[in-house]
């Protein structure tokens, strides 16, 4: 390994803010003229990102690459773990499915292979880039797992990277979690910690100052920054932990009520992110029939286990309520990927890809049937769709292990390079597609929202802001925010100094 200067961000626990701080540093380094790459050796997430060559990586690393202004590759996240069943996950290696494994088997059988994969990817990135922003996972102090971990201090050693430890003050007990983490680290690993960042701070910094002084005196580790909580950031969330903060209640101050079904194996829920930026929309994630209500737009998102999530909706009454909404109310229903499969007549699983159940009836709102297959499709796609009498060019990505066949009466939704994709009802109130990022297409999103507005007797809104522009602005806003509250120059100096010392 040679060229790149590395820095690694680890946290005291999951959702401490590692991904967002890493994203900020990708942007900061890139704007300072350094060719920068993100890296996460092993990511457990159901939010995916498809690279230009049709490979699947964690969504966070794809977004971090965008923040850095570089093209995402599988070397940036060579191992992706996608939970599919209880205690079982699909292991994705360099963007392609490797095999389904239970946690114990993965830990026992995959370790040496994983080490080789990670080392190879690190070698590629270290030789191609000037800066490498590495993200850990969970906590580096998981003493029951550390003998065979593949994502925290072992990666720091492989990359010879200094580590910044991040603590989340919003949860409380930040000093205890920081001190406890430091004390549980091996002596040599503790030497890699060049400082800590306290994240998600709310309140008066003067009240925190005595604690910062005590921490530095007690541990000898400098506090490199205290980052205030940043509202309405509009950068893709790493995992479903973020959904805990989403409202389930209707907001009467917003014109359009959007409900997203939050089934247990929800995936790629970032598909709805553009609606979070629309001033007239309120997005709710709902898990029960009682929470569903009568939304204007109902979205069935992706699922890592479509059959189990469909059974979940049938058992708790959501499926029946969807049928009643479709029959008696003017709701628009959109299913994406697994949600699209659920809208059909039936789903077959002849190979037991998801469950021992070989067939299940769907919601029967679209004339399609789906067969789950062993081979996964991962591809960037583009095509033409017709909606409200207009034609729209749309881009998206597909990640699915099923093939949906049209039945009598099917109307395709998108025409993609000579093939028909998706389905819609004659009145365009029910739509299904494999296209993730469908709503990221600004013109179509505007047409969909204006159709709903007209049906509610509201004037249409034209000239909505481009979501890509909003996200680019969000990267800059995040970078500026972190630069104001973190000692960037001190961190860079420590990065250089670290490479000159023996650890």
Swiss-Prot record:
Domain (GATase cobBQ-type) ranges: 255-444
PROSITE patterns reported in the protein's UniProt record: GATASE_COBBQ
Pfam families assigned: CbiA, GATase_3
Pathway(s) of this molecule: Cofactor biosynthesis; adenosylcobalamin biosynthesis
Gene3D superfamilies assigned: 3.40.50.880, P-loop containing nucleotide triphosphate hydrolases
Keywords from the named record: Cobalamin biosynthesis, Glutamine amidotransferase
GO aspect biological process, one term: cobalamin biosynthetic process
Cross-referenced InterPro entries: Class_I_gatase-like, CobQ/CobB/MinD/ParA_Nub-bd_dom, CobQ_GATase1, CobQ_N, CobQ_synth, GATase_3, P-loop_NTPase
Active site: 337 (nucleophile), 436
PANTHER family according to UniProt: COBYRIC ACID SYNTHASE, DETHIOBIOTIN SYNTHETASE
Family in the record: Belongs to the CobB/CobQ family. CobQ subfamily.
Protein name as it appears in the record: Cobyric acid synthase
Species for this entry: Geobacillus sp. (strain WCH70)
Lineage: Bacteria, Bacillati, Bacillota, Bacilli, Bacillales
Encoding gene, per UniProt annotation: cobQ
């Amino acid at each position: 390994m040679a060229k790149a200067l590395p820095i690694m961000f680890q946290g005291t626990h999951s959702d401490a803010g590692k991904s967002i701080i890493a994203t900020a540093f990708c942007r900061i380094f890139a704007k300072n003229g350094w060719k920068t790459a993100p890296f996460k050796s092993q990511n457990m997430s159901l939010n995916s990102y498809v690279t230009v060559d049709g490979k699947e990586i964690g969504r966070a690393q794809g977004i971090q690459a965008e923040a850095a202004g570089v093209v995402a590759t599988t070397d940036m996240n060579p191992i992706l773990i996608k939970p599919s069943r209880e205690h079982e996950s699909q292991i994705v290696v360099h963007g392609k499915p490797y095999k389904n494994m239970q946690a114990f088997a993965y830990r026992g059988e995959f370790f040496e292979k994983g080490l080789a994969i990670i080392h190879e990817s690190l070698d590629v990135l270290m030789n191609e880039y000037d800066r490498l922003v590495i993200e850990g996972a969970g906590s580096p102090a998981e003493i029951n797992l550390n003998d065979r971990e593949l994502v925290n201090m072992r990666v720091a050693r492989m990359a010879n990277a200094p580590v910044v430890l991040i603590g989340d003050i919003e949860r409380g007990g930040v000093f205890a979690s920081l001190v406890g983490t430091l004390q549980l680290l091996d002596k040599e690993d503790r030497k890699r910690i060049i400082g800590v960042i306290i994240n998600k701070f709310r309140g008066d910094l003067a009240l925190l100052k005595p604690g910062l002084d005590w921490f530095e005196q007690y541990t000898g580790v400098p506090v490199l920054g205290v980052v205030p909580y940043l509202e309405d950031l509009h950068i893709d969330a790493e995992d479903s932990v973020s959904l805990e903060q989403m409202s389930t209640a209707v907001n009467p101050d917003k014109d359009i009520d959007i409900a997203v079904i939050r089934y247990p194996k929800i995936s790629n829920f970032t598909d709805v992110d553009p609606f979070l930026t629309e001033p007239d929309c309120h997005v709710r994630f709902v898990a029960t029939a009682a929470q569903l209500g009568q939304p204007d737009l109902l979205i069935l998102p992706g699922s890592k286990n479509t059959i189990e999530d469909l059974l979940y909706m049938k058992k708790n009454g959501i499926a029946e309520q969807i049928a009643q909404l479709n029959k008696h109310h003017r709701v628009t229903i959109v299913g994406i990927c697994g949600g699209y499969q659920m809208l059909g007549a039936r789903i077959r699983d002849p190979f037991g890809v998801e469950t021992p159940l070989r067939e299940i009836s769907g919601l029967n709102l679209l004339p399609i049937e789906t067969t789950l297959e062993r081979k996964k499709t991962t591809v960037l796609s583009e095509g033409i769709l017709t909606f409200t009498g207009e034609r729209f060019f749309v881009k998206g990505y597909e990640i699915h292990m099923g093939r949906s066949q049209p039945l009598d009466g099917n109307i395709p939704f998108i025409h993609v390079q000579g093939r028909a994709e998706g389905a819609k009802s004659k009145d365009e109130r029910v739509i299904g597609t494999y296209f993730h990022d469908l709503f990221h297409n600004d013109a179509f999103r505007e047409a969909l929202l204006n159709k709903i507005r007209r049906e509610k007797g509201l004037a249409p809104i034209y000239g909505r802001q481009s979501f890509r522009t909003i996200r680019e602005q969000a990267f800059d806003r995040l970078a500026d925010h972190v630069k104001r509250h973190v000692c960037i120059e001190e961190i860079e100096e420590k990065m250089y100094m670290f490479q000159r010392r023996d650890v």
